[in-house]
Amino acid sequence: MTDICTRVAHNLRVAMAHADIKTAEDLSAASGVSVYSIRNYLAKASTPSLESLAALGLALGCTPNDLMGWNTDEAA
């Protein structure tokens, strides 16, 4: 789980920078995901649910796959 938490935290920070969203509060306002949850994701304390990934991706202009670090170009 730690590797997933680390990957999500990193990808979330990168996506926030690309979207020019500077704080967890700003991302919360844009996504509807609680500030508490976003802070936990950034602190590598938990991973987002599918619903949260979708909302965060929509707010950040990316996909849940981008946030999870899943490469959709690779063959299964």
Identify what each model region corresponds to:
Residues 1-25:
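A short, Lys/Arg-rich alpha-helix, primarily the initiator
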Residues 2, 40, 58, 68-76:
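Short, charged recognition helix plus adjacent turn
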Residues 16, 28, 57:
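The alpha-helix within a helix-turn-helix
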Residues 17, 43, 72:
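Residue-level detection of the helix-turn-helix DNA-binding "recognition helix"
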Residues 20-40:
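Short alpha-helical DNA-recognition segment
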Residues 21-23, 48-51:
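Residue-level signal for the short linker/turn that defines the boundary of a DNA-recognition helix
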Residues 51-66:
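DNA major-groove recognition helix of helix-turn-helix/homeodomain DNA-binding modules
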